[in-house]
Amino acid sequence: MDCKSSDSSGTDDDLPPSHRVPRGGGGGRGGRVAGNGRPLNLPPSYPKMYDDLAADMEAQIHQIEKEAYISVLRAFKAQGDAISWEKESVITELRKELSLSNEEHRELLGRVNSDDTIRRIREWRQSGGMQPSMRNAAQVVHDTLPSPSVSASMKTHKPNQPIPSQPFASSSPSFHPQADPTHPFASSTAKRGPVPIVKGKKHKPVFPGSSSTKHAPYHPSDQPPRGQVMNRLPSVPASSSEPTNGIDPESFLGRRVRTKWPEDNTFYDAIITQYNPVEGRHALVYDIATPSETWEWVRLSEISPGDIEWIGEDPGLGNRYNGQGHGLNRTTGPNCVPQRGSGLEKNTIRKGFRTSQNGTGKKKHLDIRIRQTDVLIREVERVLRSHNPDPYEVERAKRVLEEHEHALVGAIAKLGDISDGENEGAFRR
């Protein structure tokens, strides 16, 4: 049989691409090939590359979260180192939302405390400058302690005595952390001159331009008027050694005391909020977080035992000046800083408040102030409910509860005093 000649060249060049056999005998270098010309199997390095990319993205996201968290910490530190319950609540929620551990929190907090900008702000505060605004001064006061509840019946206001403002000679910057040893309550009103304020004395309203206008009374340098806080930079070197019988002076912060003033021979409640280790003085705040708030810097050891009453345990501080009395140890200096609230009188919430010790027999009004218990309970529950509670928050919660206990004991004692006084009056009648 005759064989017809084939037009084919005898190779697979005439076959379709999908039927061609790769040269080199067997499979090609890239492995098996699909009909579309792509390899059926990806190289083993491809999944690893995708995992590395995902891990890198996660790291970048967490870095952004840490930057956001440290920015909030820096902002709070710039406002003031006394952290309120509200700010701590914000910080706790941020740590949850941004997935930050306690170790990362401590690391970032350490970076904030060592930040050059924050350090300059602290030095500015310590150097004796004023707060940038009234809002910041109010924030520091509220951060120290929650606002106490005050009986509305005691808020009887007296007419204020207008006093012309005097320009402040110079201003210097200020700030600091935690318990600011300088004066944290100074506000924009600190640019004014001295504002004399006398407790327990009634004043007639004096109008500007009146011929009967009296000049501000002169007060000797060793006894400035009630309700004023003198300049943090005294004109003479102040001794920083205050005998506290081996007790840490900062342990008095948050304690409540009652001090007697010679103007009306009456005791007034105050809270110890700050300590200045340079001068050895503590800040006493009266009517805290109210329009009539006043404060002063004193050396507790120099107050006569008969002029101070401790609510709770008495630390037994010695009196170096043999009972010379309250008012001899206040900070002196050429420039006065009026209290927050544009110089309202200290006795605006205590009009008519008298004790039976001067023999007048007038009724003594009850003045009890304690923290809002429901707010306090909520904050303590928030600390206890957290998964890993911060030891600092737990310690602070314990301290606040102890202070609240002291306040309740003092309130019960006041109720007992009032009840005894009323019973004695009824017996005399």
Swiss-Prot record:
Biased composition of type Low complexity is found at 166-179
Which coarse location class describes where this protein primarily resides? nucleus
- Upon deletion of the gene, what happens? Reduced resistance to Hyaloperonospora arabidopsidis isolate Hiks1.
Q: Which UniProt keywords apply?
A: Coiled coil, Nucleus, Phosphoprotein, Plant defense, Repeat
InterPro entries listed in its UniProt record: EMSY-LIKE_plant, ENT_dom, ENT_dom-like_sf
- The segments labelled Disordered in the record are 1-44, 146-251
Q: Which Pfam families match?
A: ENT
Biological role stated in the UniProt entry: Probably involved in the regulation of chromatin states. Contributes to RPP7-mediated and basal immunity, especially against Hyaloperonospora arabidopsidis isolate Hiks1.
Motif, Nuclear localization signal 1: chain positions: 190-197
Query: What positions are modified (Phosphoserine)?
Result: 419
User: Does the keyword section mention Coiled coil?
Assistant: yes
ENT domain spans which residues? 57-144
Q: State the name under which the record lists this protein.
A: Protein EMSY-LIKE 4
Any coiled-coil regions, as ranges: 48-113, 393-415
